[in-house]
Amino acid sequence: MTDIPADDPKIELRSDITVELVKSAATDSDVLFAARVSTAGEQSLDELKKDPERSKGLINYLMRDRHGSPFEHNSMTFFVSAPIFVFREFMRHRVGWSYNEESGRYRELQPVFYAPDASRKLVQQGRPGKYVFVEGTPEQHELVGSAMEDSYRQAYATYQQMLAAGVAREVARAVLPVGLYSSMYATCNARSLMHFLGLRTQHELAKVPSFPQREIEMAGEKMEAEWARLMPLTHAAFNANGRVAP
């Protein structure tokens, strides 16, 4: 490994993605009253007390025929900790999402970096648009781990050197790699989350195949678990109709 000055701070390597549901206002009944106002008007809230099976059928109908707006009358806010390269993909999702991310201008960034664990498939086989990932060799895993650690140590040492010399944080951060962990709040509704999941997770029930990078899929899986707990009928209808956002 590259020699690093003895007084250089240690770095932390992680391979996980963390997602915490911070707050929510999201239930299946939000979908029902939003849909029923079309025909029941001011009586739509009374409709919520009717047969649960009828409610299940209505949600499935809305999902199947892609009547999407009733799925927007809810909110979920997640706190996500992930490498910057994950957030670059994450923030391509703009409609129905709001973000606030940790700032490298206003605080000193911590030396926490991503390194894949042994379960991460390393080798891509096939051509663009038609490929699979396969297991890496022990030698490849060792190379990835050592190369990443060396690079991270060097980059963070340089970052610290510039800060110590009085260089502004917004300038010094330019040397830090996309493997650096960041954190953000991400707020969405069920419809925007379903669109995210349709693109960023693989699932046997999906009508349309998706090929997400594993690290953003890990974030998606954790968000989906929270959403399924909050809105079980809506989640079941999403799966039953091929995991296509309405």
From Swiss-Prot:
Binding residue positions for dUMP: E89, F90, M91, R92, E101, E102, S103, G104, R105, R173, R200
InterPro entries given in the database record: Thymidylate_synthase_ThyX, Thymidylate_synthase_ThyX_sf
Keyword Manganese attached: no
A GO biological process held by the record: dTMP biosynthetic process
Active-site positions on this chain: R200 (involved in ionization of n3 of dump, leading to its activation)
Main EC class the enzyme belongs to: transferase
Record's keyword terms, sorted: FAD, Flavoprotein, Methyltransferase, NADP, Nucleotide biosynthesis, Transferase
Keyword Flavoprotein: yes
E.C. numbers: 2.1.1.148
Biological or metabolic pathway of the protein: Pyrimidine metabolism; dTTP biosynthesis
Cofactors, names only: FAD
Span of the annotated motif ThyX motif: 92-103
Binding site for FAD: S69, R92, H93, R94, E101, N189, A190, R191, H195
Every ThyX domain range: 17-241
Cofactor binding annotation: Binds 4 FAD per tetramer. Each FAD binding site is formed by three monomers.
Molecular functions (GO terms): flavin adenine dinucleotide binding; NADPH binding; thymidylate synthase (FAD) activity; thymidylate synthase activity
Reactions the enzyme catalyzes: dUMP + (6R)-5,10-methylene-5,6,7,8-tetrahydrofolate + NADPH + H(+) = dTMP + (6S)-5,6,7,8-tetrahydrofolate + NADP(+)
Homology family: Belongs to the thymidylate synthase ThyX family.
Function: Catalyzes the reductive methylation of 2'-deoxyuridine-5'-monophosphate (dUMP) to 2'-deoxythymidine-5'-monophosphate (dTMP) while utilizing 5,10-methylenetetrahydrofolate (mTHF) as the methyl donor, and NADPH and FADH(2) as the reductant.
PANTHER family noted in UniProt: FLAVIN-DEPENDENT THYMIDYLATE SYNTHASE
Record note on quaternary structure: Homotetramer.
Name assigned to this protein: Flavin-dependent thymidylate synthase
Source organism per UniProt: Streptomyces coelicolor (strain ATCC BAA-471 / A3(2) / M145)
